[in-house]
Regions:
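Charged interaction segments
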Residues: 48-123
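Short, extreme N-terminal segment that most often corresponds to the first beta-strand
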Residues: 1-30
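Short, glycine- and small/hydrophobic-rich beta-strand elements in well-ordered beta-sheets
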Residues: 32-50
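Intrinsic disorder/low-complexity segments
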Residues: 7-9, 36-38, 83, 119
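General "foldedness" signal
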Residues: 17-21, 34, 41, 73, ...
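A common structural junction motif
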Residues: 25-35, 79-88
Length: 123
């Protein structure tokens, strides 16, 4: 199964959007480092932040998983980013090129739990 985790960039209040814009370089660097360190596991960086409108941004990773234990590292990464930068995250699967969200977690949604996310994904 191909999953994705994205930083929630839509429906942000002005204050949240400003903070996201300020932290964008650090977030991109952290995700780039994770993708490069896990390239052997086919982790791919999703970095579509060219638009002037935050709501159109897509920033995160995708990676194949076959067991719930494969979710530990990416969920830990995004939980850490959520805590450090005050963001929320979206997790889901990719099927036929389309992203299907299954859960949200982070600063406002609460910490992401690997077991629950695995259940939502059907792992």
């Amino acid at each position: 199964m191909l999953i994705y985790l994205l930083i929630a960039c839509d429906r942000l209040e002005d204050k949240q959007e400003k903070k996201l814009r300020q932290n964008l370089p650090e977030l991109q660097a952290a995700l780039q480092a994770y993708a490069e360190a896990n390239a052997a596991y086919d982790v791919i960086l999703i970095n579509e932040c060219e638009s002037d409108d935050c709501e159109d941004w897509q920033l995160g990773i995708s990676q194949p998983v076959t067991r719930n234990t494969h979710l530990n590292f990416p969920v830990d990464l995004f939980n850490g980013l959520a805590e450090q930068y005050g963001i929320d995250c979206e997790v889901g699967y990719i099927e036929d090129g389309a992203r299907e969200p299954v859960s949200y977690f982070g600063k406002h949604e609460g910490k992401g739990e690997v077991f629950l996310i695995a259940e939502y994904l059907g792992l």
